[in-house]
Curated annotation (Swiss-Prot):
Function of the protein: Catalyzes the oxidation of glucose 6-phosphate to 6-phosphogluconolactone.
Pathway: Carbohydrate degradation; pentose phosphate pathway; D-ribulose 5-phosphate from D-glucose 6-phosphate (oxidative stage): step 1/3
Coiled coil, from the record: none
EC annotation from Swiss-Prot or TrEMBL: 1.1.1.49
Name by which UniProt lists this protein: Glucose-6-phosphate 1-dehydrogenase
Binding site for NADP(+): R44, K135
Source organism per UniProt: Helicobacter pylori (strain J99 / ATCC 700824)
Chemical reaction(s) catalysed: D-glucose 6-phosphate + NADP(+) = 6-phospho-D-glucono-1,5-lactone + NADPH + H(+)
Residues given in the record as substrate binding sites: H165, K169, E201, D220, K311
Keywords on record: Carbohydrate metabolism, Glucose metabolism, NADP, Oxidoreductase
GO CC terms in record: cytosol
Gene3D superfamilies: Dihydrodipicolinate Reductase, domain 2 (3.30.360.10), NAD(P)-binding Rossmann-like Domain (3.40.50.720)
Length: 425
Protein backbone atom coordinates (compact mmCIF):
# COMPACT_ATOMS: atom_id res chain seq x y z
CA UNK A 1 0.00 0.00 0.00
CA UNK A 2 1.45 3.34 -1.06
CA UNK A 3 1.52 6.29 1.31
CA UNK A 4 1.85 9.72 -0.32
CA UNK A 5 0.06 12.96 -1.18
CA UNK A 6 0.06 14.32 -4.72
CA UNK A 7 -0.97 17.82 -5.76
CA UNK A 8 -1.72 18.04 -9.47
CA UNK A 9 -1.46 21.57 -10.86
CA UNK A 10 -3.35 21.80 -14.14
CA UNK A 11 -5.84 19.13 -13.09
CA UNK A 12 -8.54 20.24 -15.54
CA UNK A 13 -6.13 20.26 -18.49
CA UNK A 14 -5.89 17.85 -21.41
CA UNK A 15 -2.85 15.87 -20.19
CA UNK A 16 -4.33 15.37 -16.73
CA UNK A 17 -7.64 14.16 -18.09
CA UNK A 18 -6.16 11.94 -20.82
CA UNK A 19 -3.16 10.44 -19.03
CA UNK A 20 -2.46 11.41 -15.43
CA UNK A 21 -5.61 10.46 -13.53
CA UNK A 22 -5.84 7.21 -15.47
CA UNK A 23 -2.19 6.50 -14.60
CA UNK A 24 -2.82 7.16 -10.92
CA UNK A 25 -5.79 4.80 -11.08
CA UNK A 26 -3.54 2.16 -12.66
CA UNK A 27 -1.07 2.51 -9.77
CA UNK A 28 -3.97 2.22 -7.32
CA UNK A 29 -5.18 -1.02 -8.90
CA UNK A 30 -1.70 -2.58 -8.87
CA UNK A 31 -0.43 -1.41 -5.48
CA UNK A 32 -3.24 0.21 -3.51
CA UNK A 33 -3.16 3.46 -1.51
CA UNK A 34 -3.23 3.85 2.24
CA UNK A 35 -6.50 5.31 3.46
CA UNK A 36 -5.03 8.76 4.05
CA UNK A 37 -3.16 9.01 0.72
CA UNK A 38 -4.60 11.94 -1.21
CA UNK A 39 -4.67 13.31 -4.72
CA UNK A 40 -5.38 17.03 -4.55
CA UNK A 41 -6.56 18.21 -7.96
CA UNK A 42 -5.77 21.87 -8.49
CA UNK A 43 -6.90 24.31 -11.15
CA UNK A 44 -7.84 27.93 -11.75
CA UNK A 45 -11.54 27.15 -12.08
CA UNK A 46 -13.83 27.60 -9.11
CA UNK A 47 -15.29 24.12 -8.71
CA UNK A 48 -16.68 22.11 -5.82
CA UNK A 49 -15.40 18.58 -5.19
CA UNK A 50 -18.61 17.20 -6.67
CA UNK A 51 -18.33 19.35 -9.81
CA UNK A 52 -14.72 18.34 -10.39
CA UNK A 53 -15.37 14.63 -9.87
CA UNK A 54 -18.31 14.83 -12.27
CA UNK A 55 -16.03 16.42 -14.87
CA UNK A 56 -13.34 13.81 -14.25
CA UNK A 57 -15.80 10.93 -14.61
CA UNK A 58 -17.22 12.43 -17.79
CA UNK A 59 -13.73 12.62 -19.33
CA UNK A 60 -12.29 9.32 -18.05
CA UNK A 61 -15.19 7.01 -17.08
CA UNK A 62 -13.12 6.04 -14.03
CA UNK A 63 -16.25 5.55 -11.92
CA UNK A 64 -17.29 2.62 -14.11
CA UNK A 65 -13.99 0.75 -13.81
CA UNK A 66 -13.00 -1.89 -11.27
CA UNK A 67 -12.62 -0.20 -7.85
CA UNK A 68 -13.12 3.12 -9.61
CA UNK A 69 -15.43 4.53 -6.95
CA UNK A 70 -12.90 3.56 -4.25
CA UNK A 71 -10.13 5.33 -6.15
CA UNK A 72 -12.20 8.49 -6.51
CA UNK A 73 -12.53 8.79 -2.72
CA UNK A 74 -8.82 9.72 -2.62
CA UNK A 75 -9.37 12.75 -4.91
CA UNK A 76 -10.39 16.23 -3.81
CA UNK A 77 -10.35 19.58 -5.59
CA UNK A 78 -8.74 22.83 -4.45
CA UNK A 79 -8.78 26.02 -6.45
CA UNK A 80 -5.22 27.32 -6.74
CA UNK A 81 -4.44 30.29 -8.96
CA UNK A 82 -0.72 29.99 -9.54
CA UNK A 83 -0.14 33.74 -9.25
CA UNK A 84 -2.18 34.10 -6.05
CA UNK A 85 -0.11 33.57 -2.85
CA UNK A 86 -3.26 33.31 -0.70
CA UNK A 87 -4.33 30.17 -2.56
CA UNK A 88 -1.02 28.56 -1.62
CA UNK A 89 -1.67 29.44 2.02
CA UNK A 90 -4.84 27.34 1.78
CA UNK A 91 -2.87 24.54 0.15
CA UNK A 92 -0.30 24.59 2.95
CA UNK A 93 -3.06 24.04 5.53
CA UNK A 94 -3.98 20.65 4.07
CA UNK A 95 -0.56 19.47 2.86
CA UNK A 96 1.58 17.21 5.03
CA UNK A 97 5.31 16.86 5.62
CA UNK A 98 5.46 13.38 7.18
CA UNK A 99 5.29 11.41 3.90
CA UNK A 100 6.16 11.97 0.23
CA UNK A 101 4.49 15.13 -1.04
CA UNK A 102 4.53 15.30 -4.83
CA UNK A 103 3.70 18.40 -6.85
CA UNK A 104 3.01 17.62 -10.50
CA UNK A 105 3.53 20.68 -12.73
CA UNK A 106 1.14 19.92 -15.61
CA UNK A 107 1.27 23.62 -16.44
CA UNK A 108 3.03 25.98 -18.80
CA UNK A 109 6.74 26.47 -17.95
CA UNK A 110 6.00 30.19 -17.76
CA UNK A 111 4.33 29.44 -14.39
CA UNK A 112 7.11 27.22 -13.01
CA UNK A 113 9.04 29.98 -11.23
CA UNK A 114 5.99 31.59 -9.61
CA UNK A 115 4.64 28.23 -8.50
CA UNK A 116 7.96 27.10 -7.03
CA UNK A 117 8.34 30.38 -5.17
CA UNK A 118 4.82 30.23 -3.72
CA UNK A 119 5.37 26.65 -2.57
CA UNK A 120 8.63 27.59 -0.86
CA UNK A 121 7.18 30.66 0.82
CA UNK A 122 4.54 28.44 2.40
CA UNK A 123 7.06 25.89 3.73
CA UNK A 124 6.12 23.32 1.08
CA UNK A 125 9.72 22.66 0.02
CA UNK A 126 10.67 20.31 2.86
CA UNK A 127 12.77 17.14 2.58
CA UNK A 128 9.82 14.97 1.49
CA UNK A 129 8.78 17.29 -1.34
CA UNK A 130 9.21 16.27 -4.98
CA UNK A 131 8.44 18.28 -8.11
CA UNK A 132 7.50 16.51 -11.35
CA UNK A 133 8.04 18.80 -14.33
CA UNK A 134 6.44 18.37 -17.74
CA UNK A 135 8.18 19.33 -20.96
CA UNK A 136 8.95 21.52 -22.77
CA UNK A 137 11.82 22.39 -20.45
CA UNK A 138 13.24 25.12 -22.62
CA UNK A 139 13.38 26.11 -26.26
CA UNK A 140 17.17 26.09 -26.34
CA UNK A 141 20.10 25.89 -23.91
CA UNK A 142 19.56 29.43 -22.64
CA UNK A 143 15.89 28.99 -21.75
CA UNK A 144 16.55 25.51 -20.33
CA UNK A 145 19.03 27.03 -17.88
CA UNK A 146 16.67 29.89 -17.06
CA UNK A 147 13.87 27.49 -16.12
CA UNK A 148 16.19 25.50 -13.88
CA UNK A 149 17.62 28.60 -12.20
CA UNK A 150 14.13 29.87 -11.41
CA UNK A 151 13.26 26.59 -9.67
CA UNK A 152 16.63 25.79 -8.09
CA UNK A 153 16.39 28.98 -6.05
CA UNK A 154 13.80 27.09 -3.97
CA UNK A 155 14.30 23.35 -4.64
CA UNK A 156 17.34 21.09 -4.89
CA UNK A 157 18.18 18.96 -7.93
CA UNK A 158 17.38 15.78 -5.98
CA UNK A 159 13.81 17.07 -5.43
CA UNK A 160 13.18 17.58 -9.15
CA UNK A 161 11.82 14.88 -11.47
CA UNK A 162 11.80 15.82 -15.18
CA UNK A 163 9.34 13.45 -16.78
CA UNK A 164 9.92 12.02 -20.25
CA UNK A 165 7.18 9.46 -20.83
CA UNK A 166 9.38 7.72 -23.41
CA UNK A 167 11.64 6.50 -20.60
CA UNK A 168 8.63 4.73 -19.10
CA UNK A 169 7.86 2.73 -22.24
CA UNK A 170 8.39 -0.99 -21.87
CA UNK A 171 10.50 -1.16 -25.03
CA UNK A 172 12.88 1.51 -23.71
CA UNK A 173 13.01 -0.15 -20.29
CA UNK A 174 13.97 -3.38 -22.07
CA UNK A 175 17.21 -1.81 -23.33
CA UNK A 176 18.45 -1.34 -19.78
CA UNK A 177 17.02 -4.64 -18.51
CA UNK A 178 18.64 -6.67 -21.29
CA UNK A 179 22.01 -5.00 -20.78
CA UNK A 180 21.87 -5.58 -17.02
CA UNK A 181 20.73 -9.19 -17.19
CA UNK A 182 22.61 -10.56 -20.21
CA UNK A 183 26.41 -10.52 -19.81
CA UNK A 184 26.83 -11.80 -23.37
CA UNK A 185 25.32 -8.57 -24.67
CA UNK A 186 27.93 -6.53 -22.84
CA UNK A 187 30.59 -8.46 -24.75
CA UNK A 188 28.79 -7.68 -28.01
CA UNK A 189 28.49 -4.01 -26.96
CA UNK A 190 32.21 -3.61 -27.69
CA UNK A 191 31.55 -4.65 -31.30
CA UNK A 192 28.82 -2.18 -32.28
CA UNK A 193 29.31 -0.79 -35.78
CA UNK A 194 26.16 1.38 -36.07
CA UNK A 195 22.94 2.23 -34.22
CA UNK A 196 19.59 3.27 -35.73
CA UNK A 197 16.96 4.90 -33.51
CA UNK A 198 13.75 5.48 -35.41
CA UNK A 199 10.32 6.86 -34.52
CA UNK A 200 7.97 7.28 -37.48
CA UNK A 201 4.31 8.29 -37.21
CA UNK A 202 1.52 8.09 -39.77
CA UNK A 203 -0.28 11.03 -38.15
CA UNK A 204 0.43 14.66 -38.94
CA UNK A 205 0.35 17.51 -36.45
CA UNK A 206 -3.45 17.15 -36.05
CA UNK A 207 -4.69 19.87 -33.65
CA UNK A 208 -1.19 20.82 -32.46
CA UNK A 209 -0.36 23.05 -35.43
CA UNK A 210 0.29 26.27 -33.52
CA UNK A 211 2.40 24.51 -30.87
CA UNK A 212 4.28 22.26 -33.30
CA UNK A 213 5.12 25.08 -35.71
CA UNK A 214 7.18 26.73 -32.96
CA UNK A 215 9.27 23.65 -32.17
CA UNK A 216 9.42 21.14 -35.05
CA UNK A 217 10.54 17.52 -35.12
CA UNK A 218 14.03 18.24 -33.77
CA UNK A 219 12.88 19.83 -30.52
CA UNK A 220 9.72 17.75 -30.17
CA UNK A 221 11.27 14.30 -30.43
CA UNK A 222 15.06 14.27 -30.89
CA UNK A 223 16.13 16.61 -28.07
CA UNK A 224 14.48 14.49 -25.40
CA UNK A 225 13.19 11.08 -26.48
CA UNK A 226 15.76 9.96 -29.05
CA UNK A 227 18.80 11.34 -27.24
CA UNK A 228 17.64 9.65 -24.04
CA UNK A 229 17.46 6.32 -25.89
CA UNK A 230 20.91 6.98 -27.36
CA UNK A 231 22.33 7.59 -23.89
CA UNK A 232 20.89 4.29 -22.58
CA UNK A 233 22.64 2.43 -25.39
CA UNK A 234 25.98 4.22 -25.21
CA UNK A 235 26.42 4.59 -21.45
CA UNK A 236 28.75 2.43 -19.41
CA UNK A 237 26.54 0.62 -16.92
CA UNK A 238 27.32 1.63 -13.32
CA UNK A 239 27.39 -0.83 -10.43
CA UNK A 240 24.54 1.09 -8.80
CA UNK A 241 21.61 2.39 -10.87
CA UNK A 242 21.62 5.51 -8.71
CA UNK A 243 24.71 6.51 -10.71
CA UNK A 244 23.10 5.88 -14.12
CA UNK A 245 22.25 9.53 -14.74
CA UNK A 246 25.85 10.61 -14.16
CA UNK A 247 26.99 8.09 -16.77
CA UNK A 248 24.38 9.35 -19.24
CA UNK A 249 25.60 12.91 -18.70
CA UNK A 250 29.12 11.82 -19.67
CA UNK A 251 27.80 10.29 -22.90
CA UNK A 252 25.65 13.25 -23.94
CA UNK A 253 28.51 15.67 -23.36
CA UNK A 254 30.53 13.84 -26.04
CA UNK A 255 27.98 14.42 -28.84
CA UNK A 256 29.87 15.95 -31.76
CA UNK A 257 28.47 18.83 -33.84
CA UNK A 258 28.10 17.91 -37.53
CA UNK A 259 31.23 18.39 -39.61
CA UNK A 260 29.26 18.36 -42.87
CA UNK A 261 25.56 19.18 -42.55
CA UNK A 262 24.70 18.00 -46.06
CA UNK A 263 26.03 14.51 -45.26
CA UNK A 264 24.91 14.28 -41.63
CA UNK A 265 21.55 16.06 -41.38
CA UNK A 266 18.40 15.82 -43.50
CA UNK A 267 15.30 17.85 -42.77
CA UNK A 268 12.02 17.99 -44.63
CA UNK A 269 8.38 19.03 -44.38
CA UNK A 270 5.39 17.01 -45.53
CA UNK A 271 3.36 18.44 -48.38
CA UNK A 272 0.27 20.19 -47.05
CA UNK A 273 1.83 21.02 -43.68
CA UNK A 274 1.50 24.76 -44.34
CA UNK A 275 -2.24 24.27 -44.86
CA UNK A 276 -2.68 22.79 -41.39
CA UNK A 277 -4.70 24.81 -38.88
CA UNK A 278 -2.68 27.64 -37.25
CA UNK A 279 0.53 26.82 -39.17
CA UNK A 280 2.36 29.77 -40.76
CA UNK A 281 1.85 29.87 -44.53
CA UNK A 282 5.59 30.20 -45.14
CA UNK A 283 6.67 27.91 -42.31
CA UNK A 284 10.19 26.48 -42.40
CA UNK A 285 9.44 24.01 -39.60
CA UNK A 286 10.67 20.46 -40.20
CA UNK A 287 8.32 17.49 -39.78
CA UNK A 288 11.07 15.05 -40.80
CA UNK A 289 14.59 14.98 -39.43
CA UNK A 290 17.38 12.44 -39.76
CA UNK A 291 20.79 12.88 -38.15
CA UNK A 292 24.02 10.94 -38.41
CA UNK A 293 25.52 11.65 -34.99
CA UNK A 294 28.86 10.67 -33.48
CA UNK A 295 30.16 10.36 -29.92
CA UNK A 296 33.71 11.13 -28.84
CA UNK A 297 34.18 8.16 -26.52
CA UNK A 298 36.77 5.36 -26.71
CA UNK A 299 34.08 2.71 -27.29
CA UNK A 300 31.96 4.59 -29.84
CA UNK A 301 34.40 6.86 -31.65
CA UNK A 302 33.57 6.62 -35.36
CA UNK A 303 30.35 4.66 -34.76
CA UNK A 304 27.36 6.39 -36.42
CA UNK A 305 24.12 6.85 -34.49
CA UNK A 306 21.25 7.44 -36.91
CA UNK A 307 18.43 9.40 -35.25
CA UNK A 308 15.25 9.49 -37.35
CA UNK A 309 11.84 10.97 -36.69
CA UNK A 310 9.02 12.00 -39.01
CA UNK A 311 5.30 12.56 -39.30
CA UNK A 312 2.94 11.51 -42.13
CA UNK A 313 5.03 8.43 -42.88
CA UNK A 314 3.76 5.28 -44.63
CA UNK A 315 3.90 3.31 -41.36
CA UNK A 316 4.20 3.69 -37.60
CA UNK A 317 7.58 2.53 -36.36
CA UNK A 318 9.39 2.89 -33.04
CA UNK A 319 12.53 0.81 -32.90
CA UNK A 320 16.22 0.62 -32.14
CA UNK A 321 18.41 -1.48 -34.40
CA UNK A 322 21.97 -2.15 -33.28
CA UNK A 323 24.43 -3.40 -35.89
CA UNK A 324 27.46 -5.36 -34.74
CA UNK A 325 30.64 -6.29 -36.53
CA UNK A 326 30.41 -9.59 -38.45
CA UNK A 327 26.83 -8.69 -39.53
CA UNK A 328 25.17 -9.37 -36.17
CA UNK A 329 22.06 -7.28 -35.47
CA UNK A 330 19.89 -6.64 -32.42
CA UNK A 331 16.50 -4.93 -32.64
CA UNK A 332 14.25 -3.52 -29.92
CA UNK A 333 10.64 -2.53 -30.59
CA UNK A 334 9.99 0.48 -28.38
CA UNK A 335 6.20 0.56 -28.53
CA UNK A 336 5.58 -3.12 -27.79
CA UNK A 337 5.78 -5.43 -24.81
CA UNK A 338 7.61 -7.87 -27.07
CA UNK A 339 11.35 -8.03 -27.60
CA UNK A 340 12.47 -9.63 -30.83
CA UNK A 341 16.16 -10.29 -30.81
CA UNK A 342 17.91 -11.52 -33.94
CA UNK A 343 21.58 -12.39 -33.66
CA UNK A 344 23.27 -13.70 -36.75
CA UNK A 345 26.77 -14.78 -37.55
CA UNK A 346 28.00 -16.38 -40.72
CA UNK A 347 27.79 -19.96 -39.43
CA UNK A 348 25.30 -20.15 -36.62
CA UNK A 349 22.21 -18.01 -37.18
CA UNK A 350 20.27 -17.60 -33.96
CA UNK A 351 16.82 -16.13 -33.46
CA UNK A 352 15.62 -15.40 -29.93
CA UNK A 353 12.15 -14.15 -29.10
CA UNK A 354 11.41 -13.03 -25.57
CA UNK A 355 7.84 -12.23 -24.59
CA UNK A 356 7.52 -10.50 -21.25
CA UNK A 357 4.36 -11.92 -19.69
CA UNK A 358 4.50 -9.77 -16.56
CA UNK A 359 2.03 -6.93 -16.23
CA UNK A 360 3.69 -3.61 -16.88
CA UNK A 361 2.48 -0.15 -15.99
CA UNK A 362 1.84 2.27 -18.83
CA UNK A 363 4.60 4.92 -19.25
CA UNK A 364 3.12 7.72 -17.12
CA UNK A 365 2.04 5.28 -14.43
CA UNK A 366 5.49 3.67 -14.37
CA UNK A 367 7.21 7.03 -13.88
CA UNK A 368 4.73 8.31 -11.31
CA UNK A 369 5.25 5.10 -9.37
CA UNK A 370 9.04 5.60 -9.48
CA UNK A 371 8.76 9.15 -8.13
CA UNK A 372 6.90 8.13 -4.97
CA UNK A 373 9.89 6.29 -3.37
CA UNK A 374 12.34 8.86 -4.81
CA UNK A 375 13.80 6.72 -7.63
CA UNK A 376 15.48 9.11 -10.06
CA UNK A 377 17.11 6.90 -12.66
CA UNK A 378 14.16 7.06 -15.09
CA UNK A 379 14.15 10.85 -14.94
CA UNK A 380 16.56 13.23 -16.66
CA UNK A 381 19.12 15.24 -14.69
CA UNK A 382 19.48 18.94 -15.49
CA UNK A 383 22.96 18.33 -16.89
CA UNK A 384 21.53 15.74 -19.31
CA UNK A 385 19.17 18.38 -20.66
CA UNK A 386 21.94 20.94 -20.97
CA UNK A 387 24.23 18.53 -22.81
CA UNK A 388 21.46 17.59 -25.23
CA UNK A 389 20.60 21.24 -25.86
CA UNK A 390 24.24 22.07 -26.65
CA UNK A 391 24.05 19.50 -29.47
CA UNK A 392 20.54 20.48 -30.62
CA UNK A 393 21.42 24.19 -30.68
CA UNK A 394 24.19 23.51 -33.23
CA UNK A 395 21.61 21.82 -35.47
CA UNK A 396 19.09 24.65 -35.04
CA UNK A 397 21.77 27.18 -35.95
CA UNK A 398 22.49 25.12 -39.07
CA UNK A 399 18.79 25.15 -39.98
CA UNK A 400 18.62 28.92 -39.54
CA UNK A 401 21.68 29.35 -41.78
CA UNK A 402 20.35 26.86 -44.36
CA UNK A 403 23.36 24.59 -43.89
CA UNK A 404 21.02 21.83 -45.07
CA UNK A 405 17.99 22.51 -47.29
CA UNK A 406 14.39 21.98 -46.24
CA UNK A 407 13.12 19.24 -48.54
CA UNK A 408 9.51 18.34 -49.22
CA UNK A 409 7.95 14.88 -49.13
CA UNK A 410 4.60 13.42 -50.08
CA UNK A 411 2.46 12.39 -47.12
CA UNK A 412 2.48 8.63 -46.47
CA UNK A 413 4.55 8.02 -49.59
CA UNK A 414 8.21 8.71 -48.81
CA UNK A 415 10.91 6.51 -50.35
CA UNK A 416 13.05 6.23 -47.23
CA UNK A 417 16.09 4.50 -48.73
CA UNK A 418 16.40 7.09 -51.50
CA UNK A 419 15.68 10.02 -49.19
CA UNK A 420 18.29 8.98 -46.61
CA UNK A 421 20.99 7.94 -49.08
CA UNK A 422 23.33 10.90 -48.23
CA UNK A 423 23.48 9.78 -44.57
CA UNK A 424 24.43 6.19 -45.36
CA UNK A 425 27.12 6.89 -47.95
Amino acid sequence: MLDFDLVLFGATGDLAMRKLFVSLYEIYIHYGFKNDSRIIASGRKELSNEEFLALLCEKTQLHSREKGEEFLTHISYLRVRLDNPKDFEELSKIATNNKPLIFYFSISPSFFATTAQNLAQNALNHANTRLILEKPLGHDLKTCKEIFQSISAFFKEEQIFRIDHYLGKKGVQNILELRLNNPILNILWDQISAVEICVYETLGVEERGEFYDKIGALRDMVQNHLLQVLSLIATDLPNDLKDLRQEKIKVLKTLQPPKDFTKQVIRAQYQGYRDENKVHKESQTETFVAIKAFLDTPKFKGVPFYLKHAKKMPRNQASVKIHFNAVNTLEFFLSQDKITLTLKDHQNPLILETHNKQEFLQPYAKLLYDAIPNNHYNFAHQLELEASWVFIDTLIEGFINNATPLYSYESHNLNESEFLKPLYQ
